[in-house]
Amino acid sequence: MFPQEAEVVVIGGGVVGSSVAYFLARAGKKVVLIEKGCKGGEASSANAAFVWSITRKPGIDIRLAMHSFDIHRQLKAELEMDFEYVRGGGLMIIEDETQLTFVEAHLQKRAEDGYPIELIDPDKVLELEPHLAKERVFGAAYSPIDGFTNPMFLVLALNLEAKKQGAGLFHHPEVLDIEVADGQVKGAVTDKGTIKT
């Protein structure tokens, strides 16, 4: 049965929306997640699946990436379903002297901020990734903390646990409008009915 009210309506059921629904439901909120298509069928199904810090800029960008690592480790321990999170390290391949100069500056700033990243020589790069074209490898930046996940499995795992925590998950309704009165959201209008908040 389609809900008529909720404390929180989460619009979008990809990795971000499913994460929001899971953490709010776990905190005891009455949550409804609305996804107009299939579970994780939009951006979450088309991303590179990296849990990645190597290319992040110093400051808030790298701090958010580091927080993402913490959340992935937490979710790996909490969620029943394996979402294939692997922390196997990451490489940013350097192909010439110009790229090397750029990467060295990036590495220096990252090292100053205390994040693990190092410059490795072509032999070490090819040891880690032997299928690269040897003649094009000048070196690489290597981050031992980077990894990847299966975003589709992550969405499914989050949905499963959010539902166990009491969240309502609805796939295929479309949110058409947001009702606002006196500066507050009062509801989400969908093609299946309005959910009051």
Identify the role of each PLM range.
Residues 2-16, 32:
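Beta1/beta-strand and adjacent pyrophosphate-binding region of the FAD-binding site
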Residues 27, 113, 165:
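Conserved dinucleotide-binding and phosphotransfer motif residues
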Residues 35, 87, 121-122, 171-173, ...:
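Short loop/edge segments at beta-strand edges and connector loops
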Residues 98, 129-137, 179-186:
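A short, glycine/Asx- and small/polar-enriched loop/turn
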Residues 141-197:
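Helical element adjacent to the flavin cofactor pocket in flavoenzyme catalytic cores
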